[in-house]
Structure formats: C-alpha cells, structure tokens
Amino acid sequence: MKDRLIEFGYAAGWRLVRVLPLSVARRLFMAAADRAYAANGPGTQRLRRNLQQIVPDMPDLLVRAGLRSYARYWLEAFRLPTQSRQQLLAGLGMSDENFAELKSLIADGRGVVLALPHVGNWDAAAAWVVSHGWPMVTVAERLKPEGVFEQFVAYREKLGMEVLPLTGGRRPPLDVLAERLQQGIVVALLGDRDLSRGGVEVSFFGGRTRMPAGPAILAIRTGAPLIAVDLSFTPTKTWAVLRRITPATEGALDVRVKATTQLLADAFAQGIADHPQDWHMLQKLWL
C-alpha cells in the first residue's frame, strides 16, 4: 500500500503541476522549500553539511537558497513534457564557443560523453540536446518502488532520450553505452555520486569521495570526446558551461581511469564553487 501511495503521489504531482499557472506553481514550490528549511529535517541537515564542505564560512541562508534551487528543478522537471520544441531550446543557454564546439564534436560521429554533477536542471539540458535532433542515451538509478522508476523512465523517454537501468537490465549498461558512442550517439551521465560501491576515490573540495568510473572508462575505451558539463540557474533559464577533459594516457587502464575521474572531479568543483546553491546534493557524499 505504501508503494502504491508513493507512485500515486508522483503521478499526481506530474499531472497537477502541468496544469497549474506557472506563477501559482512557483509560489507553491518555493513555499515548500521554505518549509523544508524551517523544519530542518535530515535532507536539509545533509545539504547544510555538504555546502559547509564547499563554503566553510557560509551564511545559513545558502541552505535556504539551495532548497529553493532544488524545488525549482522539480517544478521545471514536472512541466518539461508540456513544452514545445522551441520552448525546450530556449530553456537552456551557453556561449557561442561552447555551442560550436559541441556541434562540431557531435558532427564528427564518434559520439560524445557528457558528464555532470547534480546541478541546475539536467533534464532540461537533456531535452535541449534531443530537441536539436541529436540522439541521446542516459542511465537511471532503479528507484523503489518499481512503479516510480518506471514513471521516471517513461518521463525521460517522452522527452526523447533512451534510458538504460543502472541495474537489472538485460546487458551491462557500459557495454550498451559503448555501442551507442560508436553509433555517434550522445551519452549523458551524472558523475558526482557513486551508486555502485565500485567507484573511483577522488579528492573533492578538500575531502575524499567516490565518483563513478563510467564516464572515464567510456572515453578511454572508445575515444569519444569527454566533456564536463556545468549547469546553473539564471532568472529565466538553465545556463551551461562545457569543459573539455583530455583523458589520461599514461599507465594501466585503472590508473588512467582514476586520473581522468579526478580531472572530472576538479571540473565539477570549479562549476559548483561558482554557484553552490544550484548543487542538489542532499545525500552523504564524503567518505
């Protein structure tokens, strides 16, 4: 019964937010974020500790700003399927230089690995990619209950991307992703939190954590370009900054994967430090 209620809650949220006027929905979501800040529950406390790792002398209002940013992600994510192609394209911006580089790399036909932390609105970024006519594949954590996972998969497939389960699929996701890169398809992966317990240990904001090895392995094995993507919120859209990563070439594969993952961690840190309020990390990260 609990699982059914959770599934119903997500489904109702998706439907309700889509039909509400944006101004009304925004007020509701910001009020919910402020209530979460005042309640100071486990997620809020964890966000505070994570932000203190980044900004040791931070004002506590940064936590409130972080919760509001997270609420904005959910508000926008729920409403994405109702938007037109032109609205999806207008919802994300980047510099002309970054756009030209990305377009050129995709046109080369070797695929592109886009790795990013949990920042800004990654679903809006994915929708922007596929709205350009560039096929894209990603991996989704198998959430519980199963019905919620299926809703998230259906939601992202409706936006135009292929979604592979992190676990429980017919084939290992890395094998499928490597094939997709060889077909010239864009691979997008969240890369700041390891879910497999087999991640690479890296230095991150003065502490040690583990990050998934997948982006580095794919880039090294296939030769596909590797890009660290930084996303942040402006008043009207998501803004992207692309940082090209050159994979390590010296040593055994595990040595190169570790060094390349550290380069990604450094690039992630650079972006997060610029806008810590837009990093949606409400889980334990550091070892």
Each model region followed by its residue ranges:
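Membrane-anchoring hydrophobic helices of lipid-metabolizing enzymes
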Residues: 1-116, 149, 153, 160
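Soluble or luminal CAZymes and related metallo-dependent hydrolases
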Residues: 8, 43, 94, 169, ...
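Non-catalytic C-terminal accessory region of glycerolipid acyltransferases
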Residues: 36, 54-60, 64, 104-106, ...
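Active-site metal-coordination segments of metallo-dependent hydrolases
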Residues: 45-46, 145-146, 209-212
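A conditional alpha-helix N-cap/helix-loop micro-motif detector
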Residues: 91-96, 118-119, 145, 167-171, ...
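Conserved beta-strand termini and adjacent loop/short-helix elements that scaffold enzyme active sites
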Residues: 97, 139-141, 166, 243-245, ...
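Short amphipathic alpha-helical segments and helix-helix/interface helices
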Residues: 99-103, 126, 152-153, 177-178, ...
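Catalytic core of membrane glycerolipid acyltransferases/transacylases, capturing the structured
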Residues: 108-168, 197-200, 233
